[in-house]
Swiss-Prot record:
Functional summary from the UniProt entry: Catalyzes the conversion of glucosamine-6-phosphate to glucosamine-1-phosphate.
The species this protein was found in: Nitrosococcus oceani (strain ATCC 19707 / BCRC 17464 / JCM 30415 / NCIMB 11848 / C-107)
Organism phylogeny: Bacteria, Pseudomonadati, Pseudomonadota, Gammaproteobacteria, Chromatiales
Cofactor(s) required for function per UniProt: Mg(2+)
Annotated protein name in UniProt: Phosphoglucosamine mutase
GO molecular function: magnesium ion binding; phosphoglucosamine mutase activity; phosphomannomutase activity
Family: Belongs to the phosphohexose mutase family.
The protein's enzyme class: isomerase
EC number per UniProt: 5.4.2.10
Residue numbers bearing the Phosphoserine modification: S101
One Gene Ontology term, aspect cellular component: cytosol
Residues the record marks as active site: S101 (phosphoserine intermediate)
Amino acid sequence: MEKKYFGTDGIRGKVGERPITPDFILHLGWAVGRVLAQGRQSKVLIGKDTRISGYMFESALQAGLSAAGVDIRLLGPMPTPAIAYLTRTLHAKAGIVISASHNPYYDNGIKFFSSAGTKLPDEIEVAIEAELEKPMQTATSSRLGKAERVVDAAGRYIEFCKSTGPASVDLSELRLVLDCAHGATYQVAPEVFAEMGADITVIGASPNGLNINENCGSTALESLQHKVLECKADVGIALDGDGDRVIMIDQRGEIVDGDDILYIIARARQRTSKLTGAVVGTLMSNLGLEKALATLGIPLMRSQVGDRYVLEMLQCNGYSLGGESSGHIICLDRTTTGDGIVSALQVLVEMVATGHSLYELKSGVVKYPQCLINVQVARSINLHDNNAIINAMQEAENQLGDEGRVLLRPSGTEPVVRVMVEGRDISQVNSLAQQLAQEVAFHLGNPQICP
């Protein structure tokens, strides 16, 4: 059954436009209660990031769950991975996150964790949507759910993050700059690194409900780069609005992205004989990562784009480490979902253990130039049914040989085909990408190429 509301990462959109409206979220809370938390002793956790609309949707979810007879535990502003962890350790039936991740403040969304702290399977999302088609029926007064705050939520998560590194690790020799994106990590992230001894300078930690991800965080790195150089710091750490992704900056002010971080952690796990099987990336992971891992004898498997698919491939194959270029890093030997704080900590631990700088640790990955062009299309189409496009792809692949890749990928959320070409020669890469983009635009009937 095709889903009407759920995308690859829950439900997301612009506040005030359906489905991101108070009445829909009220109904959603009731539907979730009906599906996930049946039974008198059921409880569901609710956490949020720092968007101003989070208060409104928290109240709506709370009312809907209560109407379904479900007890609620309120976490307040809390990183997405913290909600996954607390859902599991507090033995809740489900965890609900109110966040639109790295999006601007005027967007918001709802995503869910199962009792095991993992994302919901498709069949549960389908069941929730089926309940949404029914009118709400409020439980009798004696069976309404109650709400309480979890007063030690932040402390529990801080201790968990610290526990993902060796007990003896001391970060006192490291000078860090931490950018919390005015988001959900603004309280807990500084505490984690400070309690482990690091000398930290914090930016992006003054949320006002409207400034989340605004010129800060993992998608806007300029301020952090400047601060790292100004403070002569060893490392910059940029988290996103809900704390599930991280990008780092080395002492030279250069970006260390998700591919670099994945390589560093993989090499660290291999060094300590703790790497399980292959590393999982995505179709967009840089070819340089694949080549670098190959020199270590570590295979790279590629999933569809999206941390949900990375996690599925990890679980299906019994692997422990995967991630995306965007900074979603999943360390299944430490936690159940992408966690920016935990991932950054693994890198810092490796710096201390080896005595190497972040620049030195990432130097094993030589990135291949990559050109990505978005082509607006008039209609959805199976690209593999178009012989002209297939022939153009094959010709580009032949020109690149073993030293490049071509990827054409329809967007799952907008009428766009993403054309990506990767190779050693940047001029060849750009030329082939432009040729393929023009071919796609010509055959799909809306010859407009977006930046």
